[in-house]
């Protein structure tokens, strides 16, 4: 589907597979847990979804597969085309930028980058990088796009029990933070 202005279509998927929709104000939660996202008029928040599992190794391959929750099998999914394969076959450039523990084979056939590589400051400390690192260099990348493109930003997300390490102090709103 061509864009009206002739520019390439750019789709940015932000994947944070351990986040609970019930705790996002975007989905009706009564506390303002994501006010910056709410201010962006271009956000599409998918509301009628559920996870195939509670671990990245299952939930990530499932969300990019054609299989539903009931019929999903990790081994079967490895040998099927997933959403990213189909986008690539349709002529899209497809990139995966990761701030978690990898794509669990979802991005094996496309371009991928480990955002944590190089331990960039001020985003990284020890074994962790805040998800803001996924935005590092993104604006420059967006300016150089000449073809339809899908970019997946895989967040570390809200894995416990060290929740307080998932965000910089400037975003600390709810206490106690168990740090």
Kindly give the residue locations of the regions a language model identified.
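Active-site-proximal alpha/beta segments of enzymes that process anionic O-linked groups
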Residues: 1-13, 18-178
């Amino acid at each position: 589907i061509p864009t009206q202005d002739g520019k390439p279509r750019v789709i940015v998927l932000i994947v944070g597979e351990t986040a609970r929709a019930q705790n996002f104000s975007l989905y009706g939660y009564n506390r303002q847990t994501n006010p910056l996202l709410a201010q962006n008029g271009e956000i599409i928040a998918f509301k009628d979804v559920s996870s195939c599992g509670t671990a990245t190794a299952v939930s990530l391959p499932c969300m990019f597969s054609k299989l539903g929750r009931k019929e999903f099998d990790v081994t079967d999914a490895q040998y099927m085309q997933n959403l990213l394969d189909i986008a690539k076959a349709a002529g899209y450039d497809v990139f995966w930028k990761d701030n978690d523990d990898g794509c669990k084979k979802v991005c094996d056939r496309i371009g991928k980058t480990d955002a944590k590589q190089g331990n960039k400051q001020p985003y990284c400390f020890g074994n962790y990088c805040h998800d803001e690192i996924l935005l590092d260099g993104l604006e420059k990348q967006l300016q150089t796009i000449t073809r339809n493109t899908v970019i997946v930003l895989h967040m570390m997300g809200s894995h416990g029990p060290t929740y307080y390490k998932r965000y910089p102090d400037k975003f600390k709103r709810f206490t106690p933070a168990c740090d």
